[in-house]
């Protein structure tokens, strides 16, 4: 198989990371999380640096910096980067982990309160419903009920809807979060809280899981049964190349820049035959296409291993597994 580019001179949608972003990613193994954070924040326009990172590489940076130390980076991130992070961090297979969901909402809220509230009332509304269904008990005071007594432990932001956290440790954050939502839009707040009782949790979570599956499939994360195909052995006949190799267009017009991760191939290509092969590639479009395809393979491996809260060591291991997997498939 050979690669070609239709228009090497024109701007292409798949590009290398921004200059500082590229430097940080190339030095990823040699920099500590604190140093990466300081370099980003020391830039004249740190938001531009973070927004230019592919979602997958952004996730790696968050894990390198640390979940509780990454708030400055979360503040600079795009909604798509937030969503990618949540899709990988708050799910246990096909179910949302309430504690993890609340923990990451707290981090986003602390990083950028106005943007988090705006996002939760729009793209993240389903997650907000699910978190509140799990975490809150709601009482409604009728307008003509003048003898209504506020039960102990309940609080209100409007004198009509009274809330209580089911988890005492989560109560301070849920009180602040619901207050921020009420302050942003009283109508949206009342609609949200009033609708909790009429929403079927299992149906909502099933819909959220379907949407998550679609989003992650764009990055190569496949359902478990499909992902298993990466371990299927290849016969010698499948590896034979007869005649002229096919030419593959790598101009990739219309491909979002954010879909081209840098780190998976960088981690896997530091040694061995793969490193030698990559060193001979000079066309940046070809290299970007290989990055994209390789990241998909690494994410396919991750789909088999499970996607629940992967840490940095696991990410590195999964990135280095596709070359070994390819070798073992051939040997079989």
Q: Where in this protein do the model-derived segments appear?
A:
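General marker for long, soluble alpha-helical cores
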Residues: 1-76, 80-332
């Amino acid at each position: 198989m050979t690669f070609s580019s239709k228009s090497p001179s024109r701007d292409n949608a798949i590009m290398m990371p921004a200059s500082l972003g590229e430097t940080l990613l190339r030095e990823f193994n040699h920099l500590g999380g604190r140093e990466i954070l300081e370099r980003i924040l020391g830039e004249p326009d740190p938001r531009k640096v973070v927004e230019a990172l592919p979602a997958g590489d952004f996730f790696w940076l968050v894990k390198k910096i640390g979940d509780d130390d990454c708030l400055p980076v979360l503040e600079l991130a795009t909604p798509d980067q937030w969503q990618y992070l949540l899709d990988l961090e708050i799910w246990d297979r096909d179910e949302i982990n309430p504690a993890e969901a609340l923990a990451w909402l707290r981090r986003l809220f602390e990083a950028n309160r106005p943007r988090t509230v705006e996002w939760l009332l729009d793209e993240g509304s389903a997650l907000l419903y699910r978190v509140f269904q799990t975490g809150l008990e709601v009482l409604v005071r009728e307008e003509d009920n003048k003898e209504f007594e506020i039960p102990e432990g309940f609080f209100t932001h409007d004198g009509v809807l009274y809330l209580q956290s089911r988890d005492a440790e989560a109560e301070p954050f849920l009180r602040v979060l619901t207050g921020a939502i009420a302050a942003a839009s009283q109508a949206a707040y009342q609609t949200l809280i009033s609708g909790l009782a009429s929403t079927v949790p299992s149906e909502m979570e099933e819909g959220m899981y379907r949407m998550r599956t679609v989003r992650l499939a764009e990055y190569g994360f496949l359902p478990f049964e499909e992902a298993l195909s990466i371990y299927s052995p290849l016969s010698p006949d499948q590896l034979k190349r007869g005649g002229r190799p096919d030419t593959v267009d790598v101009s990739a017009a219309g491909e979002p820049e954010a879909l081209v991760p840098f780190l998976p191939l960088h981690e896997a290509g530091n040694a061995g035959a793969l490193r030698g092969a990559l060193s001979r590639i000079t066309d940046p479009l070809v290299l970007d296409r290989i990055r994209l395809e390789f990241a998909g393979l690494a994410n396919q491996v991750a789909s088999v291993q499970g996607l629940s809260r992967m840490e940095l060591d696991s990410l590195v291991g999964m990135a280095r597994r596709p070359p070994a997997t390819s070798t073992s498939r051939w040997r079989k």
